[in-house]
Design a protein with these regions (language model features):
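Radical SAM/AdoMet-radical enzyme domain recognition
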Residues: 58-59, 63-72, 81-217
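Short, small/polar residue-rich loop motifs at catalytic or cofactor-binding pockets
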Residues: 273-277
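Radical SAM enzyme core and accessory elements
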Residues: 1-6, 330-410
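Flexible, acidic/Gly-rich N-terminal and inter-domain linker regions that tether
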Residues: 1-17, 29-33, 406-410
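Local cysteine-cluster metal-coordination motifs and their immediate loop/turn environment
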Residues: 26-36, 290-293, 333-350
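Canonical Radical SAM [4Fe-4S] cluster-binding loop centered on the CxxxCxxC motif
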Residues: 13-49
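Flexible glycine/acidic-rich beta-alpha junction loops that bind and position SAM and/or redox cofactors
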Residues: 145-150, 212-230, 251-266, 295-304
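C-terminal accessory region of radical SAM enzymes
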Residues: 233-263, 293-345
Length: 410
């Protein structure tokens, strides 16, 4: 039976400590679906704050016991601050070595970038210096028309006719990126307007040489009546293309997973979906957050959830509510009884922002219909794929028996 390419679940299977530096809140783009509603050009992290953050974090070895760490850099667009990032990474390496820290040589520097500055000399020098410890994902949303529908250049002129897409500025850097990180995957975001372009976009990314496409629907309440049906149709058409063209052998799309679409087991399926509360994020002011989605620039209507700062450390009482978070303490009765609940995702920050009160224990369910549509298409995908593989296996066995029976016995 042919091998099926599986999704990469991340370095150390996603079990490393994740610490995020919000180095800037500025970006060249103004993506329409971006959850960072408070981007600005003023809030840039200083070296003094970054150094203090590192000194504090590395002094708390008893508090942070994970065997490995991912040092994550985001914005805005992180590579706008490549000089600061380079200095941070140099200092981290020196201090982890000097302290004989258990994270020394058990770390990654991680970036999610819009790709526009990827080819520049300073970014490339940084990559050469740190390549063996780097994870870089360039966001390209698919075909030109899908990408340029949402990922547009920032402008003071809001007239639709003045919008300028960023596809050409990103796609030119994809060959260089893949030559340096051949197994890297991209992240694709789906909102209501670009549902019709899902199939063509995933296939286009495969054609560009990207083998892993991590794709998800936005968690915000943006969906319209009938979106779920159109979504299901696009995924079924995509499933047909992937299977009929044997793309499943070398490519993967995260929409299709054997693990989703089953009833929940209360004992075994009770983990929180994301790492909010286990991860840590620090901003330009030196404030600490349980996740970047709880910083002010990520929130539409709620106050930021600050759990400490880099001078005084973490206030465990402010972090405590996150320690008891699980699926059952925040989900609705409908979620409990859903027959296809497994794999239905949520974002803890969106739960908080969309809740009727300032709580993290009220799950946002805007993607409910979209998840169910995904499950229906996912069932179609696996049924068709396993049927094809079984037929191929049967044919191989038949040919083997034929060859055996045709041998001349002397």
């Amino acid at each position: 039976m042919e091998e099926i390419k599986n999704l990469d679940y991340g370095w150390r299977n996603g079990m490393a400590k994740n610490i995020t530096f919000i180095v800037t809140k500025d970006c060249q783009l103004a993506c329409k679906y971006c959850y960072l509603v408070g981007k600005n050009t003023q809030e840039r992290m200083s070296w003094e704050v970054a150094k203090q953050a590192i000194d504090y974090l590395l002094s708390q070895e008893q508090l942070f016991r994970e065997e490995a760490v991912v040092w994550d850099f985001i914005g805005g667009e992180p590579f706008l601050e490549i000089e600061l990032i380079d200095r941070i990474c140099d200092y981290l390496k020196i201090e982890m070595y000097r302290k004989n820290h258990h994270w020394f040589n058990a770390y990654r520097f991680s970036f999610s970038t819009n790709g526009i500055n990827y080819h520049t000399e300073k970014v490339q020098n940084f990559i050469k210096k740190n390549h063996s410890h780097l994870s870089i994902g360039i966001t390209i949303d698919g075909t030109r028309r899908k990408h340029d529908l949402n990922r547009i250049w920032k402008t003071s002129d809001t007239a639709p006719l003045k919008e300028k897409g960023s596809y050409d500025d990103v796609v030119k850097n994809i060959p260089l990126w893949l030559s340096q990180f051949p197994s890297a995957g991209t992240k694709v975001t789906i909102s209501s307007a670009d549902i019709p372009y899902i199939k063509e976009s995933v296939l286009h990314l495969y054609e560009l040489g990207i083998q892993e496409v991590n794709i998800n629907c936005v968690f915000e309440d943006v969906w319209k009546e009938g979106d779920d049906k159109l979504f299901e149709k696009q995924l079924i058409d995509l499933a047909d293309a992937i299977i009929d063209e044997d793309l499943y052998r070398e490519h993967v799309c995260s929409f299709f997973s054997e693990a989703i679409g089953k009833p929940l087991d209360r004992e075994n399926d009770n983990r929180n979906w994301c790492g909010a509360g286990n991860m840590l994020s620090v901003d330009a002011a030196g404030n600490l957050y349980p996740c970047t989605r709880f910083a002010l620039y990520s929130l539409r209507s709620k106050k930021p959830w600050i759990i400490g700062n880099v001078w005084d450390g973490i206030d465990q009482n402010k972090l405590r509510p996150f320690l008891t978070l699980d699926r059952w303490t925040q989900s609705t009765e409908q979620c409990f009884g859903c027959e296809v609940a497994s794999g239905c995702a949520w974002c803890q920050g969106e739960n908080y922002d969309a809740a009727a009160t300032p709580t993290i224990y009220q799950r946002a369910t805007a993607i409910c219909k979209m998840h169910k549509a995904r499950v229906r298409a996912n069932n179609y995908y696996w049924n068709k794929l396993f049927h094809k593989l079984q037929v191929e296996q049967d044919m191989e066995e038949l040919e083997r028996q034929k060859r055996k029976s045709n041998k001349v016995i002397c």
